[in-house]
Amino acid sequence: MKQHIFLVEIGTEELPAKELRRLAQYFTANFINELNANGINYNDINWFAAPRRLAIKVNSINSIPTKSYMEKRGPAINKAFDAEGKPTPAAIGWARNCGITVNQAERFTTDKGEWLIYRMLVETKPVQKLLCSMVYNALTKFSSLTKIMRWGEKNYKFIRPVRTITLLLDDLVIPGNIFGIDSNRIILGHRFMGESVISLLHADYYPNVLLERGRVIADYELRKDTIRRNIEIMVKKIGGFTKINDKLLEEVTSLVDWPIVLTASFNANFLRIPAEALIYTMENNQKYFPVYDAKGKLLPYFIFVTNIESTNTNQIVVGNEKVMRSRLADVEFFFNIDRKQKLEDYLLLLGQVKFQMELGTLLDKSYRLEILASWIAEIISTDIKQAARAALISKCDLMTQMVFEYPEIQGIIGMHYATLDGETELVALAQKEQYLPLFSGDNLPTTLVSCAVSIADKMDNLAGIFGINQQYTKQANDPLALRRAALGILRIIIEKQLPIDLLSLIDKAVFLYNKKLTNTIVVEQIIHFMLNRLLSWYKKQGYSIDTINAVMAVYKPTGKLIHFDARLRAVHYLRQIPHAENLTKRIFNIIAKHKDLINGEVNFTLLKQPEEVILINSITQLHKKLILFFEKGKYQEALWELINLREIINTFFSKIIIMTENKELCINRLNIINKVRQLFLIIADFSLLQCSKEKSNVD
C-alpha cells in the first residue's frame, strides 16, 4: 500500500502566546483521534506552531483506511433457537433487519454466554476524501478548550480569524472549504522578512521552505531551544548568569517567528529598588530576561528577544532600553511614594478595606492575627513578641503603591520595607513567608516565627469563611483557596513537627471572631474538611487508604497532629513485616468474633496456666513503658515493643484453649487478648487493614 505525507496548516491572526503550545498539542490530539476513528494508519506525526499558524505533518500515512466492520449483536443462542433447533421469531426478525438469514449469522462467545452476531464490512473512502472533514472536526472542538472569536458574515468561530488553509497530500492539494476558505498550497512567511507569500510544492518541504524562504522557524521546540542557547551565549559575553523562567521562555517562543537575542542595560541606580519589583516588571511587563551575578544578585542588564533581523541592532537595543527606563522609572516612583512613611503607618489604612463583607476589615483581621500568632508562638516555643509584631503588620504592604501595581509581589515588598524600617530579620522574613506554601509541593516557611504567622493567616481565613457558610469545597476549583490553606497548615505542622492540635487551633481562631460567625457547627466542619485534606495528602504520598483510615479511626482532633503522622508511619512500617501484620490481624479478628463476651478487666484468680500469667504480666509491664513512648510520639518504637510480644502471644494461642467450655475462663482469656488489642488501638485500628500490602514507595 502506497504511503504519503500529509500537511495541514491553519494560517491565522496572532494566536494567544500563553496558550500556543497547548493549542497546537490539542489540535494534534484531535487529529490523531480522527485518524484512529477512520482507521487510517500512519508512522509518526509532528506538530508546528508559530504566532500566526498551527500545523501538523503526518508521515507515512496510508492512502486507504484499514478495513473496518460494523457489528450487530443478535439474541442469545438460547433465545435464538427453540428446543428443536429452529430459529425463533426473535432471531428471524433480527436477521431480517440486518438483511441476512439466520444461517448467515455468525456466533460469538464470552464468559457470559453465546450470541448471534452479524459483521458487516464498512465501505471505506480513499484518504483524500476524508482528510478535509477530519481537519474540520479537529478544529471545531477548540471551543471546549479556550475562548473563541467570531468573524465574517457567516459568524465563523475559532480562536483567532483564519486567513489561509493549506491541505497537501504529498504534492496534491486536498480540495475543501473550512471557515469559508478554499484549501490551497499557499503559506505565509514572516511579516517583514523573506517571502511573504510562498507556494508550497510538497508537504514534506514544509518546515524547511518556511525556514529558508519565509524566515519562520515553524518548529516550536527548535525555536525555543534557539532562544535558550542564544540567551546563554549573550549572558556569558557580559560575564553574568541567568535564571531562565520557563513560563517566560514559552511565552517569548510563542511571540516570535524568527528570534534574535540581544543584550541591553539600564541605569544601576535603579538597583536600590527591591530586586523582585524590577524582575517582575522585566519578566511580566516587558518579557525580558534579567541578568544576575555569580551570587544571584541582579545586574543592570537584561536580555530581550526581537522578531526581526536588522543591520542596525543598536537602534533596536536603544529603543528597548528607553522602554525599560520608563518602566523602571514608574517602579521607582511607586517605591519613593511608599517610602515616605513606615510600613506600620499603613496599618490604620487597612480599616478602609473589607476582608469580607460579614467579617470586618483587614485591620480587624490584623488584630486577630496578632493574637492568634502569639498563641501559636507560645505553643511551638518561639519568640512571642516577634510573632505578634510580624502578624500585626503582615497586611500593611497591601496598602502600598507597589503592591497595588504589582499584586504578585505582596509579602515580598512587605519584607523589604520592614527591613528598611529596621524591623528584626525574623519579622521582616515573616512578611514574605506568611503566604507559603503557595501551592502543593511548594517550600514551607523557614523560621518558627514565619510558621506561626502563616498558620494564623490561613486558619483565620478558614474560620471566617466556614463561619459564615461561604465555603465552596465541592467545586473542582478552589475559588477561595480553602483547600490550599488547609493543606498549608497541615504541611507546616507535620513537616516542621510542631506540637499543635487541630481542635485547639480551630477553637482559638473561631473565638477571635467574637461572635461574628453565624455557623454553629463551624468547628466540626473545619475539622472534617481538614482531615479530608490530610487523607488526600497522605494518599498522594503513597500511603494506602486503609492504612490512613486505620489511624484516622483512633485519632482525636485534641491530639497533636504530629502524633497522627507518627502513628501512620509506624503502621506503614509494620505492614512491611508480614509476621507483624499477621499478629495484629489474629488478635483483632478473635475479638471481633467474640466481642459480646468481653466484660472488662482480667480476673487474676482465674489464671490457671503459666502462659496466661506470662502474657498478662508482660502486658502490664509493657504498658508503663508504652505510655512514655506515646507521650513522646514514638509510635514506631512502641509498635515494635508490642511486636516483640509475638512469641509470648503465639505461645499463648498454641497452648491455651481460649474458647473453653468453662465460660468464665473463656471470657477471662478473651479479656487478656483484648488487653493486647487495646494497646494496639492506641496506635491504630488494625482491623481496618486489608490483606493487600502497603506500598513501599513512601519516603
Curated annotation (Swiss-Prot):
Catalytic activity: tRNA(Gly) + glycine + ATP = glycyl-tRNA(Gly) + AMP + diphosphate
GO BP terms: arginyl-tRNA aminoacylation; glycyl-tRNA aminoacylation
Subcellular location: Cytoplasm
Keywords of the record: Aminoacyl-tRNA synthetase, ATP-binding, Cytoplasm, Ligase, Nucleotide-binding, Protein biosynthesis
Gene Ontology MF terms: arginine-tRNA ligase activity; ATP binding; glycine-tRNA ligase activity
A Pfam match: tRNA_synt_2f
SUPFAM superfamilies tied to this protein: HD-domain/PDEase-like
Claim: Aminoacyl-tRNA synthetase is one of the keywords in the record: yes
EC number: 6.1.1.14
This protein's GO CC annotations: cytosol
Domain of life according to the entry: Bacteria
Assembly and interaction partners: Tetramer of two alpha and two beta subunits.
Family per record: Belongs to the class-II aminoacyl-tRNA synthetase family.
Alphabetized HAMAP family for the sequence: Gly_tRNA_synth_beta
Protein name according to UniProt: Glycine--tRNA ligase beta subunit
Native source species: Baumannia cicadellinicola subsp. Homalodisca coagulata
Primary gene name: glyS
